[in-house]
């Protein structure tokens, strides 16, 4: 009986520990500004000497000024993470501005390390995400100025501007100093080196010629 109780306790502690490690680690001091030049390799960045820290380590100028030029898929992502603001190190948050051309989109992608909460600043967006296997349930919504939508961590999601005449702008907050992004089309058809067309033809149940054509396209590196 004692052995069973000990095993149960150990299991619960292990689960609690795993949950604690499932997000960015909590800071153990007021701040830990990332030392981008440190040779020390850690999960994140080593701390800059607090005596060398100044206000600019917590600052980034002009995120909401002029509209950004959009790319081939009709969007432009301006990411502010620990690489742009070293003071974000250990704080578990980052932010992005997304500009959408008329009929532009931020294509299906995932953030492996972060939940995202999106707020529409201008225009209208059609957004959605898909749950994991086996259900693959699709949740979608049309958002207008001021509306907010959440994309759970790790799930495939997208945003699309359905207006053929007007652009749209949104701000996204993400629950990691470095959320990462995997744009699905880029990863599958634009990997370097390419995934075997035998593998992809079987996976998508199409001819290898179709896969070869897809892999030959220019895949836009548009993600955050």
Curated annotation (Swiss-Prot):
GO terms for molecular function: manganese ion binding. It comes from the Eukaryota. Residues 1-22 form the signal peptide. GO terms for cellular component: apoplast. It is found in: Secreted, Extracellular space, Apoplast. Disulfide bonds join 32-47. Glycans are attached at residue 76. Pfam families: Cupin_1. The keyword Phosphoprotein does not apply. CDD domains: cupin_OxOx. Keywords: Apoplast, Disulfide bond, Glycoprotein, Manganese, Metal-binding, Secreted, Signal. InterPro entries: Cupin_1, Germin, Germin_Mn-BS, RmlC-like_jellyroll, RmlC_Cupin_sf. Mn(2+) binds at residues 109, 111, 116, 157. Residues 62-212 form the Cupin type-1 domain. Belongs to the germin family. Oligomer (believed to be a pentamer but probably hexamer). Plays a role in broad-spectrum disease resistance. Probably has no oxalate oxidase activity even if the active site is conserved. Member of the 12 germin-like protein gene cluster located on chromosome 8 in the major-effect quantitative trait loci (QTL) for fungal blast resistance. Partial suppression of the 12 germin-like protein genes increases susceptibility to the fungal pathogens causing rice blast and sheath blight diseases. PANTHER family: GERMIN-LIKE PROTEIN SUBFAMILY 3 MEMBER 3 (PTHR31238). This is Germin-like protein 8-11.
């Amino acid at each position: 009986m004692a052995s069973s109780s000990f095993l149960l306790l150990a299991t619960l502690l292990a689960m609690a520990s795993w949950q604690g490690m499932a997000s960015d680690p909590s800071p153990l001091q007021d701040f830990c500004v990332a030392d981008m030049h440190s040779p020390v390799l850690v999960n994140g960045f080593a701390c800059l000497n607090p005596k060398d820290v100044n206000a600019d380590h917590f600052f980034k100028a002009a995120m909401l000024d002029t509209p950004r030029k959009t790319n081939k898929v009709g969007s432009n992502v301006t990411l502010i993470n620990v690489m742009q603001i070293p003071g974000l190190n250990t704080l578990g948050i980052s932010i992005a501005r997304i500009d959408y051309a008329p009929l532009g989109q931020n294509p299906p992608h995932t953030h492996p390390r972060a939940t995202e909460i999106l707020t529409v600043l201008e225009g209208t967006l059609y957004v959605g995400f898909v749950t994991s296997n086996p259900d693959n349930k699709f949740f979608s919504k049309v958002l207008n100025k001021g509306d907010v939508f959440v994309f759970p961590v790790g799930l495939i999601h997208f945003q699309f501007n359905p207006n053929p005449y007007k652009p749209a702008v949104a701000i996204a907050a993400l629950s990691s100093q470095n959320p990462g992004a995997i744009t699905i089309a880029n990863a599958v058809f634009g990997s370097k080196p390419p995934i075997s067309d035998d593998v992809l033809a079987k996976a998508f149940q199409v001819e290898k010629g179709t896969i070869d054509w897809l892999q030959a396209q220019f895949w836009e590196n548009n993600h955050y």
